[in-house]
Amino acid sequence: MESSADNTVPKQAESVFIREILENPLMPNLPPELAEIAKFVSFEGNVKPSIPVNWRLAESISALKAFEATFLNYLAHRKYGVRPSNVSINTDHATLFLMSPMLTQIEDRGEVRPFSPFDTLTAELFPNRDKHRANASLQRALITNIYKTKDGRFYHTHGGMNPEPTLQALGLPVEGEVQDTSEVVTDRIQQRLSKYDATHLDHLLNEEHRQAGTIVYSSAEYFASEHGQKNGKVGLYEVIRDPNSSQPAAWWPDHPNAPSSPKRPLAGLKVVDLTRAIAGPTITRSLAEMGASVMRVTSPDITDMSVLHQDLNWGKWNSWLRLDVESDRQKLRDLILDADVVVDSYRPGVMKRFGFGYDEVFNLVRDRSRGIIYVRENCYGWYGPWSHRSGWQQISDACCGISTSYGHAMGLEEPVTPALFNSDYCTGICGSTAVLDALVQRAEKGGSYRVDVSINYYNQWLVRSVGTYDEHTWTDLFRRHDAPVFRHYHSMQYMLPKLLTALYKFDGEILFQREFFGPFRSGALNTTFIQVRPIARFKDDAIELKYNVGTRGNGVDAPTWPADLRREIVRDEDEQGSGFRSGSGLGSGSIAD
């Protein structure tokens, strides 16, 4: 029987890290040296969990952060020949990683205040790229929710970044009424969905209208399904060597003004970021934190979640290209030809349609002296009948049984999607760690590599390897937070503020410690933000986690690699190699002194 001393969040996080990641039979190709390097990781933190959700979220994110830090130690050892560094993971600090967008503060006229996506300063710093007014009304916002169907099942609809196609597919008006309340709107949508059987609704939205949505399953139902069986054979990610690539073994080229070193292991690594939302941008932000130079590419013609840019655009230049224009496609090819990693998190098939799927990218670099890493991230996983579908964190949570279990844990006979962005952010860490894995493989074996990541892969692991709290721990956790009960029709916008209020009230001294936060300066915006610090703490800063450049909105930079990778803003003239000039804002993305 496990002793009470072992049943603490830090001890359980360590157990998950060792037994459920490093020794996981679904992760058979991990380097055997990781077992020894893992001994350099220590866990600390409060003995009890803080987030009133039955799933062991603190243990999950802490174990994944330990995995990422261990692989970074391994890469540094292989590339630079240095001894692994001691690293500590504070489980309370790691918990904040799952809610970091809501914790941002900003220095404004000498005062520090919470960052709000609704004030005028935010609009100046991060121009709104929500072209489809996704949350402009309750009608548009609440189409993303769980509703009951005609046959007594529950279904999670999702409006994505444009709710109109889903509303129109269901025969609902795209705008509500002026006097609408949340209750009125959820009742209106519920009445409409109660006319559909779940399977009919699933086909209507996904196959006929290509909109995100899923029947809400239990974990047992998911793993018994054809899709669950085909994807259930995958661990946290897959790294697959391109059989047609023959480039010799190689690291990335060293860069004169951003030399890679044990202290900044990924310095000089160039990453092309083709991502939106949360999971994909988390992959590239994590690589930037380790020293990589990231060029994010979006378009002035597509919508984006600007409310997340203060959190997820750190360490990235942000450029615009129109991929339906050949000259812009050539600019993207030029970026890729000088890069070592491409990350794609758009709906499966979108980038291939423009000529930038993994096969096309592998072929593009076939004649150069080194291969490339291509990361593709989706919701459902890359096998089975749902792999082509669009999806989001809430969809994956509902699909894999996370929502069903949480609702039952609160004493309900209905599913409830947990608040926070747990699955998204954790999937991002799986992706960044997989890139480290692939970089080492390329350095040892040569060639190009595809990395497959999905939110379902993470959630499968959460269900099978991490699990929920035992009855005693869950009862104590639930009651310590005044037993908060949410319903299936409660949206994220409703639950998140209530959850944060409870955390500040009951866990403030544990979670929101000053040492977990730091000032980050964006030279591009001439603004200082207070953000959650990097989670892994390497002893004596042997490995320094920070950002080379500050956050910003979309379209600020030219779509070209600058001659000086320390440039804060990339201008068109950088293509001619003008390099650094006075006032370019070196290193402004670092934690401010």
From Swiss-Prot:
Keyword set, alphabetical order: Acyltransferase, Transferase
GO molecular function terms listed in the Swiss-Prot or TrEMBL record: acyltransferase activity
Gene name of the record: nodX
Amino acid composition bias (Gly residues), ranges on this chain: 580-593
Recorded metabolic or biological pathway in which this protein acts: Secondary metabolite biosynthesis
Function: Acetyl-coenzyme A transferase; part of the gene cluster that mediates the biosynthesis of the indole diterpenes nodulisporic acids (NA). Nodulisporic acid A (NAA) and its chemically modified derivatives are of particular significance because of their highly potent insecticidal activity against blood-feeding arthropods and lack of observable adverse effects on mammals, in particular the tremogenicity associated with the paspaline-derived IDTs is not observed.
Protein name (Swiss-Prot/TrEMBL): Acetyl-coenzyme A transferase nodX
EC number of the protein: 2.-.-.-
PANTHER family: CAIB/BAIF FAMILY ENZYME (AFU_ORTHOLOGUE AFUA_1G05360)-RELATED (PTHR48229), CAIB_BAIF FAMILY PROTEIN (PTHR48229:SF2)
Disulfide bonds: none
Region (Disordered): 572-593
Annotated InterPro entries: CoA-trans_III_biosynth/detox (IPR052985), CoA-Trfase_fam_III (IPR003673), CoA-Trfase_III_dom_1_sf (IPR023606)
Similarity-based family: Belongs to the CoA-transferase III family.
Enzyme class: transferase
Pfam families: CoA_transf_3 (PF02515)
Regions crossing the membrane: none
